[in-house]
Amino acid sequence: MDFPQQLQACVEQANEALRRFIAPQPFQNTPLVEALHYGALLGGKRLRPFLVYATGEMFGVCRTTLDAPAAAVECIHAYSLMHDDLPAMDDDDLRRGLPTCHIKFGEANAILAGDALQTLAFSILSDAPMVDVPDRDRLAMVSELAQASGVAGMCGGQALDLQAEGQQVDLQALERIHRHKTGALIRAAVRMGALSAGERGRAALPALDRYAENIGLAFQVQDDILDVVGDTATLGKRQGADQQLGKSTYPALLGLEQARKKAHDLIADARRSLDELAAQSLDTSALEALANYIIQRDK
């Protein structure tokens, strides 16, 4: 199976898991749950669930066991996009080629649906079946996702990003923003996949952390590049939005070609981390394919 097929299989698996976890929620057919469903299943690449599945399967964990952490991390990602798109933050009206949640359902419902997705993520991790995953590792996943999505991770990074609008920041400050805003949740996805494998997965965490940190930053560099060279129809969101908001970006700081070089260098570092795991007879091909995809994608 080539990488596009692998990614599509992950999209289908993750979407089915999300539907399964959303279906028992009360107040179906109300604007709140309709907005929740819309925000969670609006489309998207499902890269974070892919990282959960690919990492866990590398250690022989059954894919159905990985549905819970994969769906949980996507719930957090989806809620963050719903809130990022609000007028008080990035003020976007287009997401994945469709109206953003607050445009379709109103700001109040978008906020509440985002809140509900955040809490659903932790409900899934706490209660969903995970065959052969001890309580210790389940609790570790809860902690990982909480740290990655809160002040120490995604929310902290978003706050730094908002504070930096209209200001010139240096490369170190920009990397600090994105290691939190984007990278923390990517790292959590990889770590949750590893934790599902118990001690074998825990032993691999140092190499996996380096891999995740490098692809997380490369993902943001590529996003910044696409904001310059992409088009709205392909991206599914406003092209040039970062410049309009006065955000510092890697192309603005480094120039377009040096930004591309930085993305490639980060992916090369990520591959070197995988070499350590391949030397232990682990099949890292899916994680390597994702790393390559990050700098080849056009949306």
Question: What is the predicted function of each stretch?
Answer:
Residues 1-22:
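N-terminal amphipathic/basic leader segments beginning at the initiator methionine
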Residues 7, 200-203, 278:
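Structural helix-adjacent loops and short alpha-helical linkers that scaffold large soluble proteins
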Residues 12, 22, 26-273, 283-295:
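Mg2+-dependent prenyl diphosphate-binding active-site environment of isoprenoid biosynthetic enzymes
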Residues 276-279, 296-299:
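Generic C-terminal helix-cap and adjacent flexible tail
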